[in-house]
């Protein structure tokens, strides 16, 4: 029995990056032997075990053969006769097909180290095209390593396009797709993930609502980058630069879907795109089986992001409706996430990335003013039920009027014209 360190741990060590987890391949052993040594089986599809002391994953060396459609359409063969090289050859990219023996010697049959040095994401073999999930994985690696100068090899991009055109991507389960998409959105360059998918035709297959945004113009006065798709990529890049959580990045990804439905004769204006986009946002959320918090925020950002951008112009009554819609009294964190998404939207414009966004502070102050209204004095007046709700609403509206007047001063009301 021989044990080798494989995959990401080897790759990241050679790149000088932190190694967060280590995977191992076991050659020349059977499942029964590992069980006898105290390893715990965890693999549902192929023999993977957890080390009894470290908890790290140990997999028996295996080969795989295409036997059906999609990510799960493979037959696996694991036995003591499978060699390390055979196991490495089934992997997706050359940079993931390296191993180290127990003395730290590198085993690199696919020239992964050379591709690391030359910054290529290159497939190991033509068998790459048998697994549609690899399209998403390569795009995710492109998003992760773009800051280091990595790019997808032309021949690999061609295979990705072949997969996209084959219809195999439609066989991916929502759960597998969401796992890759959500991980990719949290990489250092989520914009590269979307662009890579688009360049190979996969975006049209997986997220056609987003693909439809490219080539759609916006008013240059507000969007110097003009193209809605390019704006979306810039917003995602701002999300990464500001360390936004997944829920904000997902909302930003979907916030402008309505612009993809605007008739060309109405360009570059997109009247009521917020409302028009809600049906599309719901469709993407359902298809991807996004978590509930991601679904909720994406719909709220899609519907109300223009309210946020115009926050300083909103009447106190409209502002109160916005705060109540977000339930800022019980769910303040969701309102913070909404503000963050809108700020990323505003910063994702060519040349305006560093412009201040005073709407954020203004809305936070408005929420604080509304929350500061005390309920107890109203209860002491004997108010209850609907009467209490109406009285509380009046007091909050009064507080917002005072807040706007105090913060904006002479701008609280429209200036007189001569």
UniProtKB/Swiss-Prot annotation:
Residues the entry annotates as binding Mg(2+): 21, 23
InterPro entries given in the database record: CCA_bact, HD/PDEase_dom, HD_domain, NT_sf, PolA_pol_head_dom, PolyA_RNA-bd, tRNA_CCA-adding_enzyme
Superkingdom: Bacteria
Residues that bind CTP: 8, 11, 91, 137, 140
Residues the record lists as binding ATP: 8, 11, 91, 137, 140
Cofactor(s) this protein requires: Mg(2+); Ni(2+)
GO biological process: RNA repair; tRNA 3'-terminal CCA addition
Keywords annotated in UniProt: ATP-binding, Hydrolase, Magnesium, Metal-binding, Multifunctional enzyme, Nickel, Nucleotide-binding, Nucleotidyltransferase, RNA repair, RNA-binding, Transferase, tRNA processing
Catalytic activity as recorded in UniProt: a tRNA precursor + 2 CTP + ATP = a tRNA with a 3' CCA end + 3 diphosphate; a tRNA with a 3' CCA end + 2 CTP + ATP = a tRNA with a 3' CCACCA end + 3 diphosphate
Enzyme Commission number, as recorded: 2.7.7.72, 3.1.3.-, 3.1.4.-
Single Gene Ontology MF annotation: cyclic-nucleotide phosphodiesterase activity
All copies of domain HD, residue ranges: 228-329
Annotated cofactor note: Magnesium is required for nucleotidyltransferase activity.
Stated family: Belongs to the tRNA nucleotidyltransferase/poly(A) polymerase family. Bacterial CCA-adding enzyme type 1 subfamily.
Functional note: Catalyzes the addition and repair of the essential 3'-terminal CCA sequence in tRNAs without using a nucleic acid template. Adds these three nucleotides in the order of C, C, and A to the tRNA nucleotide-73, using CTP and ATP as substrates and producing inorganic pyrophosphate. tRNA 3'-terminal CCA addition is required both for tRNA processing and repair. Also involved in tRNA surveillance by mediating tandem CCA addition to generate a CCACCA at the 3' terminus of unstable tRNAs. While stable tRNAs receive only 3'-terminal CCA, unstable tRNAs are marked with CCACCA and rapidly degraded.
Other known facts: A single active site specifically recognizes both ATP and CTP and is responsible for their addition.
Quaternary structure and partners: Monomer. Can also form homodimers and oligomers.
Protein name per Swiss-Prot or TrEMBL: Multifunctional CCA protein
Native source organism of the sequence: Azotobacter vinelandii (strain DJ / ATCC BAA-1303)
Higher taxonomy: Bacteria, Pseudomonadati, Pseudomonadota, Gammaproteobacteria, Pseudomonadales
Gene symbol of the encoding locus: cca
């Amino acid at each position: 029995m021989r044990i080798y360190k494989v995959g990401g741990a080897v790759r990241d060590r050679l790149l000088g990056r932190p190694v967060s987890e280590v995977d191992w391949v076991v050659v020349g052993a059977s499942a029964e032997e590992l069980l006898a040594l105290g390893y715990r089986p965890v693999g549902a599809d192929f023999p993977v075990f957890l080390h009894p002391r470290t908890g790290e994953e140990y997999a028996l060396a295996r080969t795989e053969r295409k036997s059906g459609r999609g990510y799960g359409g493979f037959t696996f063969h694991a036995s003591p006769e499978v060699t390390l090289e055979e196991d490495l050859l089934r992997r997706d990219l050359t940079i993931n097909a390296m191993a180290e023996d127990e003395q730290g010697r590198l085993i690199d049959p696919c020239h992964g180290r050379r591709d690391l040095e030359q910054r290529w994401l290159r497939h190991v073999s033509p068998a790459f095209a048998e697994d549609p999930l690899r399209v998403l994985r390569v795009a995710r690696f492109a998003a992760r390593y773009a800051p280091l100068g990595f790019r997808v090899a032309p021949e690999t991009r061609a295979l990705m396009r072949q997969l996209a055109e084959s219809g195999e991507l439609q066989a991916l389960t929502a759960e597998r797709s969401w796992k890759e998409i959500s991980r990719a959105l949290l990489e250092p360059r989520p914009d590269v993930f979307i662009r890579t998918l688009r360049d190979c035709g996969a975006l049209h297959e997986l997220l056609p609502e987003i693909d439809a945004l490219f080539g759609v113009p916006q008013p240059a006065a507000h969007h110097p980058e003009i193209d809605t798709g390019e704006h979306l990529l810039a917003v995602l890049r701002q999300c990464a630069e500001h360390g936004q959580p997944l829920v904000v990045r997902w909302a930003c990804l979907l916030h402008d879907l309505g612009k993809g439905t605007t008739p060309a004769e109405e360009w570059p204006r997109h009247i009521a795109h917020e409302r028009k986009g809600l049906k599309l946002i719901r469709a993407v959320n359902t298809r991807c089986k996004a978590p509930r918090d991601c679904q909720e925020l994406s719909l709220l950002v899609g519907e109300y992001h223009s309210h946020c951008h115009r926050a300083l112009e909103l009447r106190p009554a409209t502002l109160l409706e916005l705060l109540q819609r977000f339930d800022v009294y019980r769910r303040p964190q969701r309102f913070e996430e909404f503000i963050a998404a809108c700020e990323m939207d505003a910063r994702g414009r060519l040349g305006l990335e560093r412009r201040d966004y005073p709407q954020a502070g203004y809305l936070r102050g408005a929420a604080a003013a509304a929350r500061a209204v005390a309920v107890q004095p109203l209860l002491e007046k004997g108010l209850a039920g609907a009467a209490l709700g109406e009285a509380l609403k009046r007091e909050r509206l009064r507080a917002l009027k005072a807040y706007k007047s105090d913060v904006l001063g002479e701008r609280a009301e429209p200036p007189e014209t001569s």
